[in-house]
Amino acid sequence: MGIQILPPQLANQIAAGEVVERPASVVKELVENSLDAGASRIDIEIDKGGSKLIKIRDNGSGIPKEELALALSRHATSKLHSLDDLEAILSFGFRGEALASISSVSRLTLTSRTAEQSEAWQAYAEGVEMAVKVMPAAHPVGSTIEVVDLFFNTPARRRFLKSDKTEFTHIDEWLKRIALVRGDIHFTLTHNGKTVRNYRPAMNEPQYLQRLTQVAGRPFADEALRVECQHDDLRLSGYLQSPWSTVLTDTHYFYVNGRLVRDRLVNHAVRQAFAQKAEVEQPGYVLMLDIDPHQVDVNVHPAKHEVRFHQSRYVHDYILQALQSALEEAGELRFEPHSPQIDDSSPYVKPETESSAFELQSTESNAKYLGIDTTGERQAEARVVEYRSSDMPKMRTGTAVQSNAFGSMSVPRETRSGSSGESRPRAELPSKTAIASYGALLQTPSYSVQDKAYQPTLPMPSILDGQFWVFTDGPKLSLLRIESVALATRSDEIETKLATGLIGQPLLMPVSVAADTDWSSLLDEHATLIRQLGLELTIRYQQLIIKKVPPYLRDCQLARVIPEWLQSLRFEAPAPNALAIWLAEQSLTGFISAPDVWVAYCQLTEEKRQQIASKAVSLPWQSWLEEQAIE
């Protein structure tokens, strides 16, 4: 048999073997064409699982009369015209094979009208040569494509179709995926005359969360963590399954420039990000990556299910770091009791009068110094925690990105209804009794460093640059760093309490980190010391579970601080003084109130005050005056 050109019908049927696998493949190709045409509403009508009828109607730009015949021809497309267009493609379709392939294995009718035309036109192909006939029709601006009797002329393919229910399930599942990434489009899905899905346009965050609930289910949507991250030409957005959730989900959707793809790269990045945090083996996610189209090749799979990144390692590390940062931010959002907020704009406050300098206030700044975290209002209200990046590495082929921050991301705490009055649940909500007991524990007065009625007999020195106290002793002028005084008074307080043991505060959400193999023996060996610090640590399934911590560690990154402390125990057990200094350093990470530090300083013994005062730095002001006089 000699070489010859295949007839159009045969060539199209061969191509249909790759493009048209089942009715869901037809729906995918036609809906993507509607999206490329700029449609804002797409109605999908299915009969008998798609084997009898597939009808797609949109309000897009339509097809001009003179191009209808070309639309049903092979390798005819309006999406690109040159190789440069292919290398920067953003549309769903670009090969020009879908309509020709579908029409070769079905009875296809295409009706369309543009805004410039006064009437619509209808086209269909028939015969061995697939000649296209065009005739007038009635139709609004947009297009309607009817695919009747799919695989009617290829009985073998038709026999391999599953039941109507199974085939429709594939169509429904694909529509769910496209509905997530195109929240601005109104989709309807009808099967056997009954409306099954109605995805209304999601023009704001609450509406999109409703769509996410429709598609992914309420267990995923209620606990999902939002991700927003951007750096240069890369932007990652979407939702992650909560690391505290134990619900199994099949929500694993990844989009590149709006195109749903299957990619091992992102699956690996998600698993790696959740490695030390998630209780489920494969967490759910809905992630959308926007990237420069020149940096990704979408023309590598017959059905366009896969893509190839030009710098895959860079993209992998970008996604990994973005997800890790989002999870770390989420881990810091802990429930805390309600208290009023104050403006902590200035690091230190100098009182206007001597008496007002020593009035202790129950504010957030004082609580920071006393080791009590009373910033509950920040957690009780829905909020967004932003994570900002600074210097970012440039793209380098084959080089892993070492930065731990790739942009800004947010983890909203709002409820699905849009209310900002209560926090979103992460797993099981605690009982009201537990919450009340927890809040009462955090406000236990025994954690105060001093009696609130105590009034110092010495006036507080003047403050220089918000960081130093200025002391005068005759002709001597010296500066004492307030932070060092706070550290000394706090460590003295902690060392005193260590003798009887610190009282641990239960975490509403225990923190879990991967455990080293010898940590179990470390916990047994130093069990007394751990209880003395008010810590409650257990190991389960190679995970270290942190259940209780002393008040001085509540503002710390527990997933980092506790493992580092356990590592130090491998060498030697620290002395009480060293433990007190370590706890004091961990607790003094935020705002420090100068009046409170002065109150604590005045309550120390004379000997300890002298030890602290010896750290003051003398200022050679006499020499400076002499130099000024000479000049």
From Swiss-Prot:
One GO BP annotation here? mismatch repair
Q: Which Gene3D superfamilies match?
A: 3.30.230.10, Histidine kinase-like ATPase, C-terminal domain, MutL, C-terminal domain, regulatory subdomain
Q: Does the keyword Transcription apply?
A: no
- State the UniProt keywords alphabetically: DNA damage, DNA repair
Query: Which terms does the record give in the GO molecular function aspect?
Result: ATP binding; ATP hydrolysis activity; ATP-dependent DNA damage sensor activity; mismatched DNA binding
Q: Does the keyword Ubl conjugation apply?
A: no
Which intervals of the chain are annotated as region Disordered? 337-362, 400-429
Q: Mention any one GO cellular component term assigned to this protein in its UniProt record.
A: mismatch repair complex
The UniProt similarity line reads: Belongs to the DNA mismatch repair MutL/HexB family.
What this protein is reported to do is described as: This protein is involved in the repair of mismatches in DNA. It is required for dam-dependent methyl-directed DNA mismatch repair. May act as a 'molecular matchmaker', a protein that promotes the formation of a stable complex between two or more DNA-binding proteins in an ATP-dependent manner without itself being part of a final effector complex.
Give the protein's recorded name: DNA mismatch repair protein MutL
Q: Which organism is it from?
A: Shewanella oneidensis (strain ATCC 700550 / JCM 31522 / CIP 106686 / LMG 19005 / NCIMB 14063 / MR-1)
